[in-house]
Design a protein with these regions (language model features):
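Conserved C-terminal structural/oligomerization subdomain of aldehyde/semialdehyde dehydrogenase
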Residues: 25-26, 68, 75-190
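Aldehyde/semialdehyde dehydrogenase
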Residues: 1-78, 109-145
Length: 190
């Protein structure tokens, strides 16, 4: 996932985020002391690792993780990349695995430009102390199907779920979602 962070808080955020990600314990998902289990398949892990390596070859920096561990199973550690830029898979593509791309933005407007500079648009999030500004950015500047402000979570059954651009067509869930699965018919009686 892409974490677009404004200049004003970038260094502090990145330092704390890298520490938190580095502290995630990889292991058996049934073990109580494990935080992160394996990926679904080894080929998916290989694809993810290739995307990380390609991003690094093109200028990204690994701040934690980024190496396939010597463990049985399709494990991949929580990984943070910085110095992420256009032309790198970590910027341009969806990375399906525990990899976070931290991207520096000058300000809110630059953050929105970067966020929208993607062929995908399923969802996004804005974390801000200024909730009114976050709502304004979400409603008027963020080109995604869903936006969460100051939080994250799974799909809510009463809210439409779906994206824009290459992230799908239509909606599921809620009233809008129900309309995706029915045909509207006009009946005229004279």
């Amino acid at each position: 996932k892409r974490f677009i962070v404004t200049e004003e808080v970038y260094d502090e955020f990145t330092e704390k985020f890298v520490k938190a990600m580095a502290d995630i314990k990889l292991g058996d998902p049934f073990a109580e002391d494990s935080d992160l289990g394996p990926m679904a398949r080894a080929d998916l892990r290989e694809t993810l690792h290739d995307q990380v390596k390609d991003s690094v070859e093109k200028g990204a920096t690994i701040r934690c993780g980024g190496e396939i561990p010597d463990m049985q199973g399709a494990y991949y550690p929580s990984t943070v990349l910085t110095d992420v830029a256009p032309g790198q898979p970590a910027y341009d593509d969806e990375l399906f695995g525990p990899v976070a791309s931290v991207i520096r933005a000058k300000d809110d407007d630059d953050a929105m430009r970067i966020a929208n500079d993607s062929r995908y648009g399923l969802g996004g999030g804005i974390f801000s102390r200024n909730e009114d500004r976050a709502i304004e950015l979400a409603c008027n500047h963020f080109d995604t199907g869903m936006v969460r402000i100051n939080g994250f979570g799974i799909a809510a059954p009463n809210m439409p779920f779906g994206g824009v651009k290459d992230s799908g067509f239509g909606r599921e869930h809620g009233g809008f979602g129900m309309k995706e699965f029915v045909n509207v018919k006009a009946v005229f009686v004279y």
